[in-house]
Amino acid sequence: MRILGIDPGLRVTGFGVIDVSGHQLAYVASGVIKTPTADLPTRLGTIYDGVSTLIREHTPDQAAIEKVFVNVNPQSTLLLGQARGAAICGLVSGGLPVAEYTALQLKQAVVGYGRATKEQMQEMVAQLLSLSGRPGTDAADALGMAICHAHGGNTLNTLGGIAPALAKKGLRVRRGRLVG
């Protein structure tokens, strides 16, 4: 299975592509989609086109993207949400199922600690994919998103989806884990 991970951003959107066979992960590609200094619609179009090109070039089977977090600056949050929307439109237009994960879920799945630093993410991604060096921060987050989906993402989604039924039994999902 091939997974495309996306770390959305208005100026720079990171991408990472990995192959998954059982528990084995293999690096395929990573990098960034940079938008020009232009009006918002042009930048969003660049993100959409970039994601569409990635799908044509790498033919992924699934995609994973980071959920938007609420920033202290509401304007920044809105712009990030629009960039994320452009990326999701590109993914869906390419026929991919799209999974969404929070930054906390991403870091927990890749590093084992939800408050991991950018450097810790870069190092762990490099180790998990046997890279000779650390990828850039945006590419590392995108590769991490793909790794999160490959390893624990499906479990996190399943637990989240059955949370109402678990609550009736006195159980709940906390930080991606089942607790009583």
UniProtKB/Swiss-Prot annotation:
Query: What are the TM regions of this chain, as residue ranges?
Result: none
Q: Does the keyword DNA damage apply?
A: yes
- Metal-binding is among the record's keywords: yes
The record, for Pfam families, names: RuvC
Enumerate the SUPFAM superfamilies for this protein: Ribonuclease H-like (SSF53098)
Q: Where in the cell is it found?
A: Cytoplasm
Q: Which cofactor does it need?
A: Mg(2+)
A GO term (biological process) for this protein? Answer: DNA repair
GO CC annotation: what is one? Holliday junction resolvase complex
Q: Note the InterPro entries from the entry.
A: RNaseH-like_sf, RNaseH_sf, X-over_junc_endoDNase_Mg_BS, X-over_junc_endoDNase_RuvC
Q: What is its EC number?
A: 3.1.21.10
Q: Which parts of the chain are coiled coil?
A: none
State the free-text cofactor note: Binds 2 Mg(2+) ion per subunit.
Q: Which Gene3D superfamilies match?
A: Ribonuclease H-like superfamily/Ribonuclease H
Q: Which residues form the active site?
A: 7, 66, 138
Keywords carried by this UniProt record: Cytoplasm, DNA damage, DNA recombination, DNA repair, DNA-binding, Endonuclease, Hydrolase, Magnesium, Metal-binding, Nuclease
Specify which residues bind Mg(2+) 1 according to the UniProt entry for this protein.
7, 138
Q: Where does Mg(2+) 2 bind?
A: 66
Q: Which reaction does it catalyse?
A: Endonucleolytic cleavage at a junction such as a reciprocal single-stranded crossover between two homologous DNA duplexes (Holliday junction)
Q: Which GO terms describe its molecular function?
A: crossover junction DNA endonuclease activity; DNA binding; magnesium ion binding
The family classification in the record reads: Belongs to the RuvC family.
Function, please?
The RuvA-RuvB-RuvC complex processes Holliday junction (HJ) DNA during genetic recombination and DNA repair. Endonuclease that resolves HJ intermediates. Cleaves cruciform DNA by making single-stranded nicks across the HJ at symmetrical positions within the homologous arms, yielding a 5'-phosphate and a 3'-hydroxyl group; requires a central core of homology in the junction. The consensus cleavage sequence is 5'-(A/T)TT(C/G)-3'. Cleavage occurs on the 3'-side of the TT dinucleotide at the point of strand exchange.
On subunit structure and binding partners, the annotation says: Homodimer which binds Holliday junction (HJ) DNA. The HJ becomes 2-fold symmetrical on binding to RuvC with unstacked arms; it has a different conformation from HJ DNA in complex with RuvA. In the full resolvosome a probable DNA-RuvA(4)-RuvB(12)-RuvC(2) complex forms which resolves the HJ.
Q: What is this protein called?
A: Crossover junction endodeoxyribonuclease RuvC
Q: Which organism is it from?
A: Burkholderia pseudomallei (strain 668)
Q: What is the lineage of its organism?
A: Bacteria, Pseudomonadati, Pseudomonadota, Betaproteobacteria, Burkholderiales
